């Protein structure tokens, strides 16, 4: 995390990752995406996602959701987000949409502290993402976003880890399950 925040060219890398995400989304068929509110120097996907919403073809409604962590179940729920919507802090002091509709996104964009071969993701260790994914039917398509320096060649999944379907960095698509 400290290495990510200390990158001298972090802003330039973020711009490149915004571009990679925007281009990658062009060919996707999903109409709803669950993302995250960036904390601790994480890449901010929301500008690219909002442009994705604005670029929807006529007659197609696209939605973005942000997670709400449920302490009791250890799962995530998603609430509709749009620029300017009223926000409040969740149980972990992370902003979440206040009083907007809850829905289950068709795709999840998730931050990665690090990533390994085969779609292995290193997160903060809370398990919210993995518990949520293992319980959802149908399972949303999952794409991780990270900076290239986060590649950990020896990272292996544990029994509980849910692999990503794709992983994007500022250098492009690093992994996509076929």
Predicted regions and their residues:
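N-terminal active-site beta-alpha-beta segment that forms phosphate/nucleotide-binding
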Residues: 1-104
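Conserved phosphate- and dinucleotide-binding cores of soluble alpha/beta proteins
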Residues: 72-178
């Amino acid at each position: 995390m400290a290495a990510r925040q200390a990158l001298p060219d972090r802003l330039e890398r973020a711009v490149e990752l915004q571009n990679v995400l925007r281009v990658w989304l062009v060919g996707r068929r999903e109409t709803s995406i669950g993302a995250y509110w960036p904390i601790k120097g994480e890449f901010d996907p929301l500008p690219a996602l909002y442009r994705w919403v604005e670029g929807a073809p006529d007659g197609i409604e696209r939605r973005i959701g942000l997670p709400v962590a449920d302490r009791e179940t250890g799962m995530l729920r998603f609430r509709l987000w749009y620029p300017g919507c009223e926000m409040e802090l969740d149980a972990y002091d992370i902003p979440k949409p206040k009083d907007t509709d809850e829905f289950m996104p068709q795709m999840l964009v998730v931050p990665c502290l690090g990533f390994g071969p085969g779609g292995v993701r290193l997160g903060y260790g809370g398990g919210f993402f993995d518990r949520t994914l293992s319980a959802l039917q149908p399972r949303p398509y999952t794409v991780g976003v990270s900076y290239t320096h986060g590649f950990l060649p020896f990272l292996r999944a544990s029994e509980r880890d849910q692999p990503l379907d794709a992983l994007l960095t500022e250098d492009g698509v690093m992994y996509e399950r076929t």
